[in-house]
Swiss-Prot record:
It comes from Plasmopara viticola (Downy mildew of grapevine). A motif (RxLR-dEER) lies at residues 49-64. The RxLR-dEER motif acts to carry the protein into the host cell cytoplasm through binding to cell surface phosphatidylinositol-3-phosphate. Its main location: secreted. Coiled coil: none annotated. Secreted effector that completely suppresses the host cell death induced by cell death-inducing proteins. This is Secreted RxLR effector protein 38. It is found in: Secreted; Host nucleus; Host cytoplasm. Belongs to the RxLR effector family. One of its GO terms (cellular component) is extracellular region. Disulfide bonds: none annotated.
Length: 155
């Protein structure tokens, strides 16, 4: 009887802990911060911070110092190459964000505004026209060696 009670109590505690971890936004925020780089200056970190907004950049130095205290044994000072990569990523992110805002005015944009908001880097690079852009569909088949739809086969 005691064994059943212990198993039930352990199961209830585990379920409560897992459900509170899933539903608690602060736990989710901590988990997403752990996914990011501890260095703070690599390209993915800089681009992610920029795309999420400037508000988090205000507290970036505080977070870096907190990370330094928490992870003194594994903290790595960013190199010049990482700083250059962060600057490049930040410039690409800025261009992507600006071109996303100007999607309606972009002459080569074929994606919808919804697609642009899902992937802002789509707008960073101009879309290339297809090599067969001006060729009517019926002539494409002839160019590829198939039978033209308006010709008849006589055997």
């Amino acid at each position: 009887m005691h064994l059943i009670y212990i198993v039930m109590a352990a199961t209830a505690t585990t379920l409560h802990a897992s459900s509170s971890a899933i539903l608690d936004p602060s736990d989710v925020k901590i988990m997403t911060k752990n996914v990011e780089s501890r260095i703070g200056n690599d390209a993915a970190f800089a681009a992610g911070r920029f795309l999420r907004g400037a508000y988090e950049d205000v507290h970036r130095e505080e977070e870096r110092m907190f990370g330094l205290k928490q992870n003194q044994h594994s903290f790595i000072k960013p190199s010049q190459a990482q700083d250059a990569a962060a600057i490049d990523a930040l410039n690409i992110a800025k261009e992507a964000l600006e071109s996303t805002r100007n999607t309606k005015d972009h002459p080569h944009a074929t994606a919808t505004a919804g697609d642009q908001s899902l992937n802002p880097l789509i707008a960073a690079y101009p879309l290339r026209a297809s090599p067969n852009a001006g060729v009517p569909q019926q002539h494409l088949g002839v160019a590829l060696g198939s039978v033209h739809p308006h010709t008849s086969r006589s055997t």
